[in-house]
Swiss-Prot record:
The lineage of its organism: Eukaryota, Metazoa, Chordata, Craniata, Vertebrata. Residues 1-20 are annotated as: Disordered. The modification Phosphothreonine is found at T594. The keyword Nucleotidyltransferase does not apply. One of its GO terms (molecular function) is structural molecule activity. One of its GO terms (cellular component) is cytosol. It is found in: Cytoplasm, Cytosol; Golgi apparatus membrane; Cytoplasmic vesicle, COPI-coated vesicle membrane. This is Coatomer subunit gamma-2. The coatomer is a cytosolic protein complex that binds to dilysine motifs and reversibly associates with Golgi non-clathrin-coated vesicles, which further mediate biosynthetic protein transport from the ER, via the Golgi up to the trans Golgi network. Coatomer complex is required for budding from Golgi membranes, and is essential for the retrograde Golgi-to-ER transport of dilysine-tagged proteins. It comes from Bos taurus. GO terms for biological process: endoplasmic reticulum to Golgi vesicle-mediated transport; intra-Golgi vesicle-mediated transport; intracellular protein transport; organelle transport along microtubule; protein secretion. Belongs to the COPG family.
């Protein structure tokens, strides 16, 4: 019986959790009563509950003590008490991984799963599968097959769910149960049908054709379970995304037909699936949006919430498709559920006209303080999207955001506001001073180090270019006086940027930096000393290199290189060119703003750092030097062919490594000694091939081809390679995968592979392009004019140039202002070998686009390559 606590105990909270002060040693001591005769079910139940509570609270049980408690617990199978037996099953599952010799209960569990007590059979199956390994699975295979098709739904579901878990241990054994799973899928029980469909999908998910057949079968025969329908919709949408089929396919028709299902769950799943399909047109979205519009007026809050949240996502990409729902959304603004009201307003912000912005902002202001931080973030993201859509409304937005910034709130909420203000400042030059003023006010009382350093970085970047830069110095130096070490260090860097760009402020900045040299923190002192010495030289080139633009190398790569340098002392100075470059950040489309992640940010190695490590581990590539650039994968086969091959081009100083990722999609073949032979155009030289030892069915493998680049860089800039995959084939049994002993040689022709000028250039960001331009100098400057007769707009010309050259646009010059007939594009990069490369392109629109290209580098070769490739 449950103990009744005194009312006073309840109020004080002392009796709310009877297990709060449990000690592991005392509980294990109590577990000795499991060995007593006769068994006392009530006491044993209480002790098992305590053990499970400790395990779920994260209490560590040693192997010995866990095994002793487990063995004692096995005696409880002698009792016929139903509740005690089911508690034993739970304990077995929890202790399976921490106890030794858990298989001793196999016979007891097997007896229960095949017995007449239905209440035992399901839990016994789940417990047995938890302790079974791959070697024991075949012993219970017959029982599992029987259980899957059992007439008792709880037993069948238990066996099916256990089968899903057993796939991780022994996929091949579970694969033999496919006929039983097919039979269970026709069950009248909704949960059995749902679980059976899950098992069938996971058995076939690596075979697209089998999944398509399964989908076709169930869409024709129909299902009784709404849960199974939801899973089938998810399988169908995944198939559409993978196959990139047109939306005219029967699979899309099935998803659309589910919009007319009698279950609301299925209707919503179908609408959500259609909305999340890539490349969906407004016409294809219309039925899904209509269904969600009906849900907006549902009496059920959960349905209204689901509808408005999904419409909110649609509005990011297809605002015009949601416009029809505006009246329903306006009715939801006054919804008693604040989450629904918030989403309704933020959706309206994305779909409404410019004239409705002021009214909506007033409505948000009336209740924004009442909603949770999570939804405040959604509001801020909607405002950010709105700023991009209606730039002239930035002053209204800025006022609203600054008021929100003063309110109480957590880190994620404040970060979203700060990011939004920074975005407005960068996109709208006329809002710069107002935005910086609000941020300066915020850092005066900011408790978040990350945000303070981010704002100081922005002040250092944008502040020196404002009409009155001196007004920001006080706010920055206050951080040096009042804040922690990280913020003080960021403030020192910001001060240095003001001194580097404003000659009249330099004497004051030097005085402030001298004061910073007395700081208690060595990072702050080091920065102050470094910047002071650079600024005292009064050289623009030094300022550009060490203050404005900073390092462009990979930080994890630099850490490894420096560590290696310290292990092998050398008289030669450390060479910065031995470090891989950092890849330029890829800015997301602003329309696709996602919820702010709550996970802590880590300095994870980049894709290029991972490739560098993988290639360095291959003996043939050890002496190629640092990896300069890795391209995006290029597909060399059609989607539905026998073999799937794609290539990643790894560029080094004098070599290129082609990495071929190969997959064999034939289940009756094993491929061995797989290589890709490349036939280059003249001047390139193939040095060696590193084969993939074997390619079993559906398991990816990698082979490499090493090519020496021509010495004449103007020839090396572009080339075409014909590719042929060569291998030894061994036929094998599709069911067992066992190959024959004899093999034969074969080959497969792949599509041609192109090397372009962009493969030789790595993007780097230059925050201050003018300073970088002066730093490089005009020693190797060249200028030419070209006519782009086929290009009709400046935007098209800018995008084509950026894509072709593979360089990083600077100073936001990739954005062409409206109604302009001329534009300047600034591009920065590093050419293979470590040479800085800058391009200034002046574009004029007349009959087509005329382009004047000026290229600078510290070497002549990169300049010639760029002009030759453009011409």
């Amino acid at each position: 019986m449950i103990k009744k606590f005194d009312k006073k105990d309840e109020e004080s909270g002392s009796g709310s959790n009877p297990f709060r002060h449990l000690e592991k040693s005392a509980v294990l001591q109590e577990a000795r009563i499991f060995n007593e005769t006769p068994i006392n079910p009530r006491r044993c139940l209480h002790i098992l509950t305590k053990i499970l509570y400790l395990l779920n609270q994260g209490e560590h049980f040693g192997t010995t003590e866990a095994t002793e408690a487990f063995f004692a617990m096995t005696r409880l199978f002698q009792s016929n008490d139903q509740t005690l037996r089911r508690m034993c099953y739970l304990t077995i599952k929890e202790m399976a991984t921490i106890s030794e010799d858990v298989i001793i209960v196999t016979s007891s569990l097997t007896k229960d799963m095949t017995g007449k007590e239905d209440v035992y059979r399901g839990p016994a199956i789940r417990a047995l599968c938890r302790i079974t390994d791959g070697t024991m699975l075949q012993a219970i295979e017959r029982y599992m097959k029987q259980a899957i098709v059992d007439k008792v739904s709880s037993v069948s579901s238990s066996a099916l769910v256990s089968s899903l878990h057993m796939m991780k241990i022994s996929y091949d054994v579970v694969k033999r149960w496919v006929n039983e799973a097919q039979e269970a899928a026709s069950s009248d029980n909704i949960m059995v049908q749902y679980h059976a469909l899950g098992v069938l999908y996971h058995l076939k998910k690596n075979d697209r054709l089998a999944v398509s057949k399964m989908l076709n079968k169930f869409t024709k025969s129909g299902l009784k379970s709404q849960f199974a329908y939801c899973m089938l919709i998810r399988i169908a949408s995944r198939l559409l995304k993978e196959n990139e089929e047109g939306h005219e396919s029967p699979v899309f028709d099935f998803i659309e037909s589910c919009l007319r299902n009698k279950h609301e769950m299925v209707i919503y799943e179908a609408a959500s699936a259609i909305i999340h399909l890539p490349n969906c047109t407004a016409r294809e979205l219309a039925p899904a949006v209509s269904v969600l519009q009906l849900f907006c007026s549902s009496p059920k809050p959960a349905l209204r919430y689901a509808a408005v949240r999904t419409l909110n996502k649609v509005a990011m990409k297809h605002p015009s498709a949601v416009t029809a729902c505006n009246l329903d959304l306006e009715n939801l603004i006054t919804d008693s559920n604040r989450s629904i009201a918030t989403l309704a307003i933020t959706t309206l912000l994305k779909t409404g006209s410019e004239s409705s912005v002021d009214r909506l902002m007033k409505q948000i202001s009336s209740f924004v303080s009442e909603i949770s931080d999570e939804f405040k973030v959604v509001v801020v993201q909607a405002i950010s999207a709105l700023c991009q859509k209606y730039p002239r409304k930035h002053s209204v937005m800025m006022t609203f955001l600054s008021n929100m910034l003063r309110d109480d709130g957590g880190f994620e909420y404040k970060r979203a506001i700060v990011d939004c203000i920074i975005h407005i400042v960068e996109e709208n030059p006329e809002s710069k001073e107002a935005g910086l003023a609000h941020l300066c006010e915020f850092i005066e009382d900011c408790e978040h180090t990350v945000l303070a350093t981010k704002i100081l970085h922005l002040l250092g970047k944008e502040g020196p270019r404002t009409p009155v830069p001196s007004k920001y110095i006080r706010f920055i130096f206050n951080r040096v006086v009042l804040e922690n070490e990280a913020v003080r260090a960021a403030a020192v860097s910001a001060l240095a940027k003001f001194g580097a760009q404003n000659e009249n402020l330099l004497p004051s900045i030097l005085v402030l930096l001298q004061r910073c040299m007395m700081d208690t923190d060595d990072e702050v002192r080091d920065r102050a000393t470094f910047y002071l010495n650079v600024l005292q030289q009064r050289q623009m080139a030094l300022n550009a290199t060490y203050i404005f633009n900073g390092l462009t190398v990979s930080v994890p790569g630099m850490e490894k290189a420096l560590h290696q340098y310290t292990l092998e002392p050398s008289e030669k100075p450390f060479d910065m060119k031995s470090i891989p470059l950092a890849t330029a950040p890829v800015f997301e489309q602003k329309a696709e703003i996602t919820l702010v992640s709550t996970k802590p940010e880590k300095l994870a190695p980049s894709r290029q750092d991972i490739f560098q490590e993988q290639l360095a581990a291959i003996p043939e590539f050890m002496n190629l030097g640092p990896l300069f650039k890795s391209s995006e994968p290029v597909q060399l086969t059609e989607a539905e062919t026998e073999y799937f091959v794609r290539c990643v081009k790894h560029m080094f100083t004098n070599h290129i490594v082609f990495q071929f990722d190969c997959t064999n999609t034939l289940n009756d073949q094993l491929l061995e000694k797989v290589t890709v032979q490349v036939e280059p155009s003249e001047a390139y030289e193939v040095l060696c091939c590193v084969p993939a030892p074997s390619l079993p069915y559906n398991q990816p493998g990698v082979c490499y081809t090493l090519v020496r680049l021509p010495e004449d860089d103007s020839i090396a800039a572009a080339g075409t390679f014909s590719c042929t995959m060569k291998f030894t084939v061994r036929d094998c049994d599709p069911d067992t995968g066992v190959p024959t002993e004899e093999g034969y040689d074969d080959e497969y022709v792949l599509e041609d592979l192109e090397v372009t000028v962009s493969d030789h250039i790595q993007k780097v960001m230059k925050p201050n392009f003018a300073a970088a331009w002066e730093e490089v100098g005009n020693t190797f400057e060249k200028e030419e004019t070209f006519a782009l007769s086929s290009t009709k707009t400046l935007e098209e010309a800018v995008n084509n140039i950026i894509t072709f050259l593979g360089m990083q646009p600077c100073e936001r010059s990739d954005k062409v202002p409206e109604n302009k007939n001329s534009h300047s594009l600034y591009l920065a990069g590093v050419y293979r070998g470590g040479y800085d490369l800058l391009v200034r392109s002046r574009l004029a629109l007349a009959d087509g686009v005329t382009m004047q290209v000026t290229v600078r580098s510290k070497e002549g070769t990169p300049v010639d390559v760029i002009l030759a490739s453009v011409g």
